[in-house]
Amino acid sequence: MELRLYDTLSREKRTFTPLDPSNVRMYVCGPTVYDFAHIGNARPVIVFDVLFRLLRHVYGEAHVKYVRNITDVDDKINDRAARDFPGLPLNEAIRKVTEQTEKQFHDDVDALGCLRPTVEPRATEHIGEMRDIIDRLIAGGFAYVAADHVLFSPQAMNAKDGVLPRYGALANRSLDEMIAGARVDVAPYKRDATDFVLWKPSKPGEPSWPSPGGIAVQGRPGWHIECSAMSWKHLGERFDIHGGGIDLVFPHHENEVAQSCCAFHTERMAETWMHNGFLQVEGEKMSKSLGNFVTIRELLATDKFGGKRWDGAVLRLAMLKTHYRSPIDWTVEALHEAEKAIYDWSEFTKDATPAPCDEVIDALADDLNTPKMIAELHGLRRVGKPAELLGALQLLGIGRVFRQTIEIDVNAQALIEARTAARARKDFKESDRIRDELAAMGVVLKDGKDADGKPVTTWEIAR
């Protein structure tokens, strides 16, 4: 079997040959933990989980390392912490926000059937690596200190001879195009409009660390340097796959390439760059102003979208019906179609023992061709191969959902509402009794909070 993946940098589908087949390495940009993950955030999580599963199948579980970071230092986090916990010192409020949001993220992606990455590094745990890279860039003439900031110079990078790539190659943009697209209000301490921040001074009360480059005041990292540092720490100077959403190609991934290649004097940071396409909702861009902004948690736990809650397996299958590089239209109709298929497959495979299915593997090996993969799943159902269908579903992380869960859904939701009311009036004895009743129905509860901080309870059928 030949695995072929589309590389954003070369703009072609290429045979995937790992640098070391005994240690296949993949990095994917993870969440900034300040708010609930929305359904658009779920797309790269699901897409690269499927790739992770495929790589483990091909090379062995022990030989694949998947790193997905947690960004826990960011202006959005600071703003959310100050808003939600105005009575606490900012650093303590930030800790509460990041810990709570990270847990919410994990609960959501677990419900989507995603495996945990091999490593999930937090940015704040890698400040030393960030300073190290920045000092290398200053020493190499690629970065400079100005007004207590450290800035990277794409002009300096492109002026160097040798193995370094051209800045703008990943996004397929020239420096002139970038300058033309830069904002008019360029910071006065920048030498050039395309220069970007590696390190900046912290405001009073904000998270801060000793600065690189001999800067006397404490500061904090820019966004782009964080991923260069974490990928270097856990995967090395050069690794196999770097993934994320198409919106990250520029400037985030372009700047990662610049930082890492200049710091380590290499022509490539990752051998293959993969990016998933945008998501829209019912034919429109998702936005709060249009009222179509929906989080993973809302899809799982409320009737906001389509008048019902959706099982994580349904969301996962609906996401995979569109090829990862194409835009996806997230619709209620698509969810109903996915739900119908999963109900049918679940009944068909309920007495089966899983068996391998080469046709599904071959579809995935062709640049994660999930539409073809789903056609193969329907084909297995049509020709009566429950063992192969079950094996394929397990490989893909698509859990089985049975029709009787519809009845459980109605009863469980009523009991959950009664339990929520009991908890609100601090009747914990009644709350525990209802929890036990649900457990007897085979329902496992998970308590959390919604995007507004209100208590919300999700549930799943015990496996």
Swiss-Prot record:
Belongs to the class-I aminoacyl-tRNA synthetase family. It is found in: Cytoplasm. Its cofactor is Zn(2+). A motif ('KMSKS' region) lies at residues 285-289. GO terms for biological process: cysteinyl-tRNA aminoacylation. InterPro entries: Cys-tRNA-ligase, Cys-tRNA/MSH_ligase, CysS_C, Rossmann-like_a/b/a_fold, tRNA-synt_1_cat_dom, tRNAsynth_Ia_anticodon-bd. Monomer. Its EC number is 6.1.1.16. It comes from Rhodopseudomonas palustris (strain BisA53). The keyword Cell inner membrane does not apply. GO terms for molecular function: ATP binding; cysteine-tRNA ligase activity; zinc ion binding. Zn(2+) binds at residues 29, 227, 252, 256. Keywords: Aminoacyl-tRNA synthetase, ATP-binding, Cytoplasm, Ligase, Metal-binding, Nucleotide-binding, Protein biosynthesis, Zinc. ATP binds at residue 288. Pfam families: CysS_C (PF23493), tRNA-synt_1e (PF01406). This is Cysteine--tRNA ligase. HAMAP family: Cys_tRNA_synth. It catalyses: tRNA(Cys) + L-cysteine + ATP = L-cysteinyl-tRNA(Cys) + AMP + diphosphate. Binds 1 zinc ion per subunit. A motif ('HIGH' region) lies at residues 31-41. Its main location: cytoplasm. GO terms for cellular component: cytosol.
